[in-house]
Swiss-Prot record:
Gene that this polypeptide is encoded by: yidC
Topology relative to the membrane: Multi-pass membrane protein
Protein name as annotated: Membrane protein insertase YidC
Annotated transmembrane regions: 8-28, 417-437, 488-508, 536-556, 575-595
Region (Disordered): 33-68
Keyword terms: Cell inner membrane, Cell membrane, Chaperone, Membrane, Protein transport, Transmembrane, Transmembrane helix, Transport
Subcellular location: Cell inner membrane
Stated role: Required for the insertion and/or proper folding and/or complex formation of integral membrane proteins into the membrane. Involved in integration of membrane proteins that insert both dependently and independently of the Sec translocase complex, as well as at least some lipoproteins. Aids folding of multispanning membrane proteins.
Any one GO BP annotation for this protein: protein transport
Biased composition (Polar residues): 33-57
Compositional bias annotation for Basic and acidic residues: 58-68
Family membership noted in the UniProt record: Belongs to the OXA1/ALB3/YidC family. Type 1 subfamily.
Entry's Gene Ontology cellular component terms: plasma membrane
Length: 627
């Protein structure tokens, strides 16, 4: 799976691997879903028809062109608005474009009766029928239009967005219906949004009705149609421009040809190693403004967009779109755009497209159905029959998902039954982790102590063979073997912590429960703990440089622990001892402070355990000396 966090994980593992490898091979006396090509997939390949559209910006002639509308003639007072409020949603509809103009999410009750708080940070007050709600907007003030285009350059702003649709409300069934006739009167476009009060799903039905007396080629290989579903998702900071760190949290995804893929907004789905190849070959990897991924055999199973804590996904229930469009233009907000090339209607025929749409948190609790009659896995009469069984991959975090989910569950239980603060929950979790792996940690501490005891002999070897590295290493290994010391014996606890570290990172990066959680001076454990920001530095940064106290404390404890367990070292080893903390500081500087807090407290516990081990060892040696 092309995971957006692949680069971070590989960088982390590679860094630690280099550190341990250098220690083992060069300084032995220092303590220390597969990605597959889809069948018949046109990866980053655009058809000749598409290329003409991109270069010319004009739509290709077809039996039914998209409506041509003069935008300046639209009068706002002709637009009608309507609202639907469910247990978790507040949805505003507009007749202009027949679309969702604003989509809000509020706190709701999970499938097990627990309160899931969504309106945690900078919520908006939304008033509907005189009642106020606290909610977060997920539609970026731009809405979700679910409209067709026949030109790639118009997918973000379909001509249908400037047509006034008729609007019909059905308060009893919680549905809104729109209808509009094409300017040439050849067909009618209908859309029905049906909501279910207790669920985080809604059903969308799009109908195309041929009004003409001839066959209507609505979509064909010569006249491809693009359906924009969900645009880029919110929430996003409205008081400042998006930074690079912000944009890294927004992505789009799709399931095509049996393979799940995701990519950042405004970039192509180029994998990590492809990116490395592009770097050395000088290829940007995004030569085209648009790329189309297709699979004629199985088509698109689902597609959607996501932000740090939320996802929006459209799952075709009764059909499979031909492919998906990836808009590679910088800072685009096109989102998930489906490709259709085979919609042919006889005179008077009604062609229907049904979608199950989910908008909610990136957790299984959000996707779970509360009403078993609506759950397609339990009821054959569910309106969502045909829902993809792979939909949960929309928020899958790869091989660390079980660790992540386990950590979140443990943190929630600690939060619930002890101190209701996730900072203290992390500290208690760190203590529990230390206790569970006490035998391994103690073995590490004993190994460090033995290494220190060999320090004089190691110093002699280093001085004697200063100009012969090969012999120095050989004699060092002989000394370790003679004294039954494993130079990498202390690395196992660190290796075990790698998946824990990655799982903690993903947990604090995208789990709604930990969003905006304070601890002592830390305002938000899901963000770096910036205590001070410098003024803007000309030609370097427009926003200044933040000072992250917790990251500095982490490095301080790391240096102290290293010096506490260090043995006799040559100059190269000393340099490594000081380079590693700088490397760790770089990795942790922009990490969620919850992860840094965990690592810092692990260092503190390790320092305490090592001190106790050293103290007990000295006491034991004194007793032996007296005897």
């Amino acid at each position: 799976m092309e995971d957006r966090q692949t680069r971070l994980f590989l960088a982390l593992i590679l860094s630690m691997g280099i550190w341990m490898g250098v220690n083992y091979f060069f300084f032995p006396n220092t303590s220390t879903k597969k990605n597959t090509e889809t069948k018949q997939t046109q990866s980053d390949k655009t058809s000749e028809n598409t290329k003409q559209q991109i270069t010319s910006g004009k739509t290709k002639e077809s039996n039914s062109a998209d409506p041509v509308v003069q935008k300046e003639k639209i009068t706002p007072f002709d637009t009608k608005k309507s609202f639907i409020v469910t247990d978790s949603y507040i949805v505003e509809f507009s007749s202009l474009g027949g679309k969702i103009s604003k989509f809000y999410m509020k706190d709701f009750t999970g499938p097990n009766g627990e309160l899931i708080q969504v309106a945690r940070k900078n919520p908006e007050t939304v008033v509907v029928d005189g009642k106020s709600y606290q909610a977060v907007e997920l539609s970026r003030d731009k809405g979700f239009d679910f409209n067709f285009s026949d030109s790639l350059v118009e997918i973000s702003d379909s001509p249908w967005n400037y047509i006034q649709f008729s609007l019909t409300e059905d308060k009893i069934n919680h549905s809104i219906s729109f209808s509009a006739v094409s300017p040439d009167r050849s067909y009618q476009l209908k859309k029905e949004f049906r909501f279910y009060p207790s669920e985080n799903y809604f059903k969308l039905s799009i109908s195309i009705i041929n009004f003409s007396k001839e066959k209507l080629s609505f979509a064909s290989q010569k006249n491809v149609r693009y359906l924009r579903t969900f645009g880029s998702l919110g929430p996003y900071p409205k008081d400042r421009p998006l930074s690079d760190r912000d944009t890294a949290n927004f992505f789009r995804f799709y399931y095509l040809g049996g393979s799940f893929q995701d990519t950042l907004d405004g970039s192509s789905s180029v994998g990590f190693w492809s990116s490395v190849g592009n770097f050395f070959t000088g290829n940007s990897g995004t030569d085209e403004s648009f790329s189309i991924k297709t699979d004629k055999e199985s088509g698109v199973d689902f597609a959607g967009t996501g932000s740090r804590y939320f996802i929006a996904v459209a799952d075709p229930l009764d059909h499979k779109p031909h492919g998906i469009v990836l808009d590679n233009r910088p800072k685009n907000e096109s989102g998930a755009v489906l490709v259709y090339d085979n919609i042919l209607l006889n005179p008077g025929e009604n062609y229907n497209l049904d979608f199950a749409s989910y908008i909610g948190i990136r957790e299984s609790e959000g996707m779970a159905f509360k009403n078993p009659e609506l759950d397609p896995s339990q009821s054959k009469n569910s309106p969502f029959v045909g829902l993809s069984s792979d939909l949960n991959k929309s928020f899958n975090q790869g091989i660390t998902t079980p660790f992540r989910n386990g950590i979140i569950w443990i943190l929630k239980q600690i939060y619930r039954f002890t101190i209701p603060n996730y900072g203290w929950s992390i500290i208690i979790f760190a203590i529990l982790f230390k206790l569970v792996f006490y035998p391994l940690n103690q073995k590490q501490a004993d190994s460090m102590k033995k290494m220190q005891e060999l320090s004089p002999q190691l110093k002699t070897i280093n001085e004697k063979f200063a100009n012969d590295p090969k012999m120095r290493q050989q004699k060092t290994m002989e000394l370790y073997k003679k004294n039954n010391v494993n130079p990498v014996g202390g690395c196992l606890p660190m290796v075990i912590q790698i998946p824990i570290f990655i799982a903690l990172y993903t947990a604090f990066s995208d789990t709604i429960d930990l969003w905006n959680s304070p601890f002592l001076w830390v305002k938000d454990l899901s963000e770096p703990d910036v205590i001070w920001t410098s003024p803007a530095i000309p030609y370097f940064t427009q926003t200044g440089i933040g000072l992250n106290l917790l990251a500095l404390l982490m490095v301080g404890t790391q240096v102290f622990q290293t010096r506490m367990t260090s043995v006799s070292m040559d100059p190269n080893q000393k340099m490594l001892m000081y380079v590693m903390p700088v490397m760790m500081l770089y990795i942790f500087w922009n990490m969620p402070s919850g992860v840094t807090l965990y690592w810092t407290f692990q260092n503190v516990l390790s320092i305490g355990q090592q001190w106790i081990t050293n103290h007990l060892k000295k006491t034991e040696e004194k007793k032996k000396a007296k005897v």
